[in-house]
UniProtKB/Swiss-Prot annotation:
Spans through the membrane: none
Family from the record: Belongs to the MurCDEF family.
NCBIfam families for this protein: murC (TIGR01082)
Matches recorded under PANTHER family: UDP-N-ACETYLMURAMATE--L-ALANINE LIGASE, UDP-N-ACETYLMURAMATE--L-ALANINE LIGASE-RELATED
Gene Ontology MF terms: ATP binding; UDP-N-acetylmuramate-L-alanine ligase activity
GO biological process: cell division; cell wall organization; peptidoglycan biosynthetic process; regulation of cell shape
Record: residues binding ATP: 126-132
Localization: Cytoplasm
Record keywords, A-Z: ATP-binding, Cell cycle, Cell division, Cell shape, Cell wall biogenesis/degradation, Cytoplasm, Ligase, Nucleotide-binding, Peptidoglycan synthesis
Function recorded in the entry: Cell wall formation.
Catalytic activity: UDP-N-acetyl-alpha-D-muramate + L-alanine + ATP = UDP-N-acetyl-alpha-D-muramoyl-L-alanine + ADP + phosphate + H(+)
UniProt name for this protein: UDP-N-acetylmuramate--L-alanine ligase
The organism's taxonomic lineage, starting at the top: Bacteria, Pseudomonadati, Pseudomonadota, Gammaproteobacteria, Enterobacterales
InterPro entries: Mur-like_cat_sf (IPR036565), Mur_ligase_C (IPR004101), Mur_ligase_C_dom_sf (IPR036615), Mur_ligase_cen (IPR013221), Mur_ligase_N (IPR000713), MurCDEF_pg_biosynth (IPR050061), UDP-N-AcMur_Ala_ligase_MurC (IPR005758)
Length: 491
């Protein structure tokens, strides 16, 4: 670390100059990798471990980080601090070694809180829409010339990274409620997009506990801070009197401080008007489909307006918004003749949504933008507990597509739960008499089982949070065409 870099560190986080080497366990995750990327750009020595390489680890290696694709005690040697993701168990050999060596072990959000401590922090929380809203706020602030630092849970496509170190005073970050670690953050501004039952194992299955945790998060704001909240959400509307901070509401509701009206979707773009108190109406063209994205944009505009950002900069940022990775991510449109001999094409869209509300929003956006297309979904449930807890909601939402192919549940480390598997979910959906789902027992069979159901005027939604994103990219690479054994060997 050279003198210039040390001077920069003293100006940003004065006491962290005592820290030289930061080690991340589970560094390949988007949230972990984003923080590591910011710290690498600040001049810290970064190392980390994960089980397999991915684009996040490659980006960090390009920045000079040392990455180990194993978990061994010697990996933490000489570390000043060890940062651990919530997915890592306490008996991980690196965690055990760090404790034995009396090296501090902290969670991801604690390190994010240190980055935020000496900046003007803007934290985006909520069950759905965090990643996209974080990207929208970051895009607006960048367009306004404010050069923000951002740390996002997904790839910000315009920047090509999950995180970026800016030279301005703003830090814009996604705040994760899945393990309640967002309580470490002390931002100046907090957005809450919505609150639904998810990650309930963290909250002992008690929804009241989850709601109180969001209130506690908002109470981390200083008395002069601001909470920006979606008043369309019934839980948020219920909690508003308990926030105890200055609030700005947004939504389609007539009493919203920033109100969305006249929404219309044309293809991948949304067009709507935003009504703000004491401001001229703002006519927005948003380069992202769906009413849910209009709400995300309204949250970003509410924050930017409060900061005094020029309307023209806001409008430019939203019209040119390139989205985030795996959020209604258009991967291509492919001719079907090589796939199944039919004329016409099929569009391929990859989406991370894995909660019934998110899946429903994606389906509605697809129907609104491409009403004449057959909607084909390849869905991978994520976690047995979520499938069990939201079973009926999944069954209801998934019947809205024209054709459904379903992979086995992605376990994310969980043990199987009887009745919360994909075969059971397919059986339940079939029993409702609207569609006949197709169970795909092996991911290698996806292209082969997808080809016969395509008609030549299709929109394929590849939906889920597990490893299904890799399957989507594979389908794009082979242009949906099932591979012969010879072609697979050649690949």
């Amino acid at each position: 670390m050279n003198t210039q870099q040390l001077a920069k560190l003293r100006s940003i986080v004065p006491e962290m100059r005592r820290v030289r080497h930061i080690h991340f366990v589970g560094i390949g995750g988007a949230g972990m990798g984003g923080i590591a990327e910011v710290l690498a750009n600040e001049g810290y020595q970064i190392s980390g471990s994960d089980l397999a390489p991915n684009p996040v680890t490659q980006q960090l290696m390009n920045l000079g980080a040392t990455i180990y694709f194993n978990h061994r005690p010697e990996n933490v040697r000489d570390a000043s601090v060890v940062v651990v993701s919530s997915a890592i168990s306490a008996d991980n050999p690196e965690i055990v070694a760090a404790h034995e060596a009396r090296i501090p072990v902290i969670r991801r959000a604690e390190m994010l809180a240190e980055l935020m401590r000496f900046r003007h922090g803007i934290a985006i929380a909520g069950t759905h829409g965090k990643t996209t809203t974080t990207a929208m706020v970051s895009s607006i602030y960048a367009e306004a010339g404010l050069d923000p630092t951002f740390v996002n849970g997904g790839l910000v496509k315009a920047a090509g990274v999950h995180a970026r170190l800016g030279h301005g005073r703003y830090l814009i970050a996604e705040a994760d409620e899945s393990d309640a670690s967002f309580l470490h953050l002390q931002p100046m501004v907090a957005i809450v997009t919505n609150i639904e039952a998810d990650h309930m194992d963290t909250y002992q299955g008690d929804f009241e506990n989850l709601k109180q945790t969001f209130i506690n998060f908002l109470h981390n704001l200083p008395f002069y801070g601001r909470a920006v909240m979606c008043v369309d959400d019934p839980v948020i509307r219920e909690l508003l009197p308990r926030v105890g901070r200055q609030t700005t509401t947004y939504g389609f509701s007539e009493d919203a401080d920033v109100r969305v009206e006249d929404y219309q979707q044309i293809g991948p773009q949304g067009h709507f008007t935003l009504l703000r108190q004491d401001k001229e109406p703002m006519r927005v063209t948003l380069n992202a489909p769906g009413r849910h994205n209009a709400l995300n944009a309204a949250a970003a505009v509410a924050v930017a307006t409060e900061e005094g950002i020029d309307d023209e900069a806001i409008l430019r940022a939203l019209e040119s918004f390139q989205g985030t990775g795996r959020r209604f991510d258009f991967l291509g449109e492919f001719p079907l003749e090589p796939v199944n001999g039919k004329s016409g094409t099929a569009m391929l869209v990859d989406d991370y949504g894995h909660h019934p509300t998110e899946v429903d929003a994606t389906i509605k956006a697809a129907r609104a933008g491409w009403p004449d297309k057959k909607l084909v979904m390849l869905f991978q449930p994520h976690r047995f507990t979520r499938t069990r807890d939201l079973y009926d909601d999944f069954a209801n939402v998934l019947t809205q597509v024209d054709t459904l192919l379903m992979l086995e549940v992605y376990p994310a480390g969980e043990a199987p739960i009887p009745g919360a598997d994909s075969r059971s979910l397919c059986r339940t959906i079939r029993g409702r008499g609207k569609i006949d789902p197709i169970l795909v027992p092996d991911p290698a069979q996806v292209a082969e089982m997808l080809a016969p159901v395509l008609t030549g005027n299709d929109l394929i939604l590849v939906q889920g949070a597990g490893n299904i994103g890799k399957i989507a990219r594979s389908l794009a690479e082979i242009k949906l065409k099932p591979q012969t054994p010879e072609e697979e060997q050649h690949d």
